Amino acid sequence: MNDDLAIAQATKLKPIDEIAEFAGIERKYLKPYGNYIAKVSHRIYEELAQREDGNLILVTAITPTSAGEGKTTTSIGLSMALNRLGKKSFVTLREPSIGPVMGIKGGAAGGGYSQVLPMEDINLHFTGDIHAVSLAHNLLSAAIDAHLKFDNELEIDSTQIYWPRAMDMNDRALRKIVVGLGGKANGYPREDKFIITAASEIMAILCLAKDLEDLKERVGNIVIAKNKKKEYVLAKDLKVHGAIAALLKDAIDPNLVQTIEGTPAFIHGGPFANIAHGTNSIIATKIALKLSDYVVTEAGFGADLGGEKFLNFVSQVAGFKPSVVVLVASLRALKLHGGAKKDSITEENLEALEKGFVNLQVHYENLRKFGVPVLTALNVFPTDTDSEKKLFEKLCEKHGIPFGESRVWAKGGKGGEALAREVIKLAETHTSEYHPLYLMDTPIEEKLDILTREIYRAKGYELSPTAKAKLRSFKKNGFGNAPVIVAKTQYSISDNPKLLGAPKDYIFNIRDLNLSAGAGFVVAVSGDIMLMPGLGKEFGAQRIDIDKSGKISGLF
């Protein structure tokens, strides 16, 4: 079989006008970027608002291997399969961050015969949204240092500045820096750092805002520092929130592209799921729901990260009511959770598979707590043996877990038809009784207790002295009931990446709490979470090339 890029480049794309017409998007709302990409004005929602929503299908996964479980590929393939079965569908996904594309992860536009296209553009720059977020973020950084240099009327404490700088590249040398060197003309020296743009609060805001006015208000509410009286200083105190919103005036519009089979796709926004809420923009999904029978959307990493955040936080903010949750699993990941060595998970190992199945069980049970029908999708790999697949089926039947096989990587939409039929059956015969595990105004301590016990299966949690002090400050300043986004490892249900399978009855440690007042949540940090990745000894950029005709190679 050809590699992903060869398959993508061999596909004859439809003009974006045709994709928009099929989706029901009028030409007046389109801003084309070449022949195969277009921005869709977010204002189209005003015209569509009175229509009924289609069915929202959330795709999440078990605790993944470092290679991922294939959520994006499954999401794309499922949307194509639904279209093949006569259901008008849309897929809504996050935009890839260039840093990981150039690093170890590679591209993030699906794979095999289940891709969104044009994949080279999607993976490299796209419509410039991430660059716009970087500029907006760094305008605020520059404004802070300008204010410090010229009189500092807000009395900002230079040792209590929370706002870093941002760049969409993996660069470990920028994790800790000193700015303002070179004399008084360059400002005052202080410690600073860079984070990757996907980790910026502005990226989270872009994906949560309902319109430009809401976006501007949220940006204005970003807490950038404390002053010398220990009071919060906000972005609007520097009077740059209007300019930041202006920089994002096009970025707020969803990007329309197509799947390999011509299914409409929105690719918009890219917050990470282990440090933010981990799903594409609310605007894109809300528009798609008005245009389709079925919208397939993905939440990053496992069900304990992106899945939990979508169901507890994003759905409450947006007013979503998911119809079905699809839980993607692979035999190789289950074998890893059952004790198989990382370099041998492609080999048959029935004992490890049976032992590791408990990871799937826990995620399935957790998702059912939200009142939404859950379907497991077995992402089939060529190395899966018949004996392993039979054992998986037997275990699912034993524990009452409905499942369907996904072969979309190898067969495109046709390989997802069995899964799509099960999704349709669940959506049309089961009423979703969706409910979050906590309400928005629940105190932070109660939210943490619910999450650590119900999702992470801990017996409780413990706050570090730093986290306790910050919680007191949040309460004092009116943020004691803020929604909670837990930043933790993606490789375990717990806070320890080495605890595979289904750990339980441990203490979940929270070392820090960070306020994202503009986005509207508090981030509870557990363990070592990296906000600026680094390139490895060997990395993706070393494989990427371009010839004299402009044809790109090496992307995957």
Swiss-Prot record:
Keywords: ATP-binding, Ligase, Nucleotide-binding, One-carbon metabolism. Pfam families: FTHFS. One of its GO terms (molecular function) is formate-tetrahydrofolate ligase activity. GO terms for biological process: tetrahydrofolate interconversion. The keyword Ligase applies. It catalyses: (6S)-5,6,7,8-tetrahydrofolate + formate + ATP = (6R)-10-formyltetrahydrofolate + ADP + phosphate. The gene is fhs. ATP binds at T65, S66, A67, G68, E69, G70, K71, T72. HAMAP family: FTHFS. Its EC number is 6.3.4.3. SUPFAM superfamilies: P-loop containing nucleoside triphosphate hydrolases (SSF52540). It is an enzyme of class 6 (ligase). Gene3D superfamilies: Domain 2, N(10)-formyltetrahydrofolate synthetase, Formyltetrahydrofolate synthetase, domain 3, P-loop containing nucleotide triphosphate hydrolases. This is Formate--tetrahydrofolate ligase. Pathway: One-carbon metabolism; tetrahydrofolate interconversion. It comes from Kosmotoga olearia (strain ATCC BAA-1733 / DSM 21960 / TBF 19.5.1).
